[in-house]
């Protein structure tokens, strides 16, 4: 039987899709944006989708309706923790920003009410920057309060075969009674800093190499258009 996941701050369901591709089953998702919710419902027709502010959702009812949830996944909105926020002086950063704080609090409220075996928390690399130390401490304290041990790391998507150097903070929590979580070893590495037994990073050129550039339409196009 597939492990059943619920997602919050689901967007169009990218995290849900990744988990489904690795044997999990998405049974619940929620987002505030109706366009995103419509996309999730089309891509995961068997999932329950609620389009609402996460603060309004009773996750105990979701748990009871679904007959239990194995995992909670999601990435709270990243603007308060992004590098670009350092240049916007009029806005607060990290959990000093009310949206940054409440998004984390509501994530862990969902975790408490769903009481799954594990959780997956994703955010931008800036989440672990020194000025945002209190945000990571909040994640650590809430995890401990709810009976989870956590394992976190900044991962680069390029190290796992994706054609972009996207770095993200990944935090996985498991019940304290369960075995420790181990991050997978990189499968790829920067050819200039080669790691043994890994392939070179995949480039956009690699991805686009099989495209036929000799198209009839090219004759009608101007250079630079």
Predicted segments, located by residue:
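S-adenosyl-L-methionine
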Residues: 38-63
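Short glycine-/small-residue-rich Rossmann-like dinucleotide-binding loops
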Residues: 77
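Class I S-adenosyl-L-methionine
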Residues: 61-69, 81-225
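Conserved beta-strand elements of the Class I
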Residues: 4-6
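Conserved SAM/SAH-binding beta-strand->alpha-helix loop
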Residues: 33-34
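Class I SAM-dependent methyltransferase "Motif I" SAM/SAH-binding loop
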Residues: 9-12
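Short beta-strand element of Class I
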Residues: 26-27
């Amino acid at each position: 039987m597939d492990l059943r996941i619920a997602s919050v701050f689901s967007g169009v369901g990218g995290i849900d899709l990744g988990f489904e591709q690795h044997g999990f089953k998405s049974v619940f998702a929620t987002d505030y944006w109706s366009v995103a919710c419509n996309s999730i419902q089309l891509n995961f027709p068997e999932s329950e989708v609620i389009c609402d502010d996460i603060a309004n959702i009773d996750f105990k009812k979701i748990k009871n309706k679904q007959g239990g949830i194995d995992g909670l996944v999601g990435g709270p909105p990243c603007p308060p923790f992004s590098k670009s926020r350092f240049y916007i002086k009029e806005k607060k950063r990290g959990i000093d920003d009310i949206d940054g704080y409440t998004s984390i609090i509501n994530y862990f409220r969902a975790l408490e009410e769903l009481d799954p075996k594990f959780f997956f928390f994703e955010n931008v690399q800036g989440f672990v920057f020194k000025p945002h130390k209190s945000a990571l401490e909040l994640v650590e304290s809430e995890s401990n309060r709810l009976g989870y041990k956590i394992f976190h790391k900044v991962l680069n998507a390029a190290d796992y075969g994706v054609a972009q150097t996207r770095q993200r903070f990944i935090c996985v929590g498991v019940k304290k009674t369960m075995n420790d979580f181990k991050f997978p070893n990189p499968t790829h590495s920067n050819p200039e800093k080669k790691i043994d037994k890994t392939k070179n990073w995949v480039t956009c050129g690699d991805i686009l190499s099989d495209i036929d550039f000799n198209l009839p339409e090219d004759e009608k196009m101007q250079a630079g258009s």
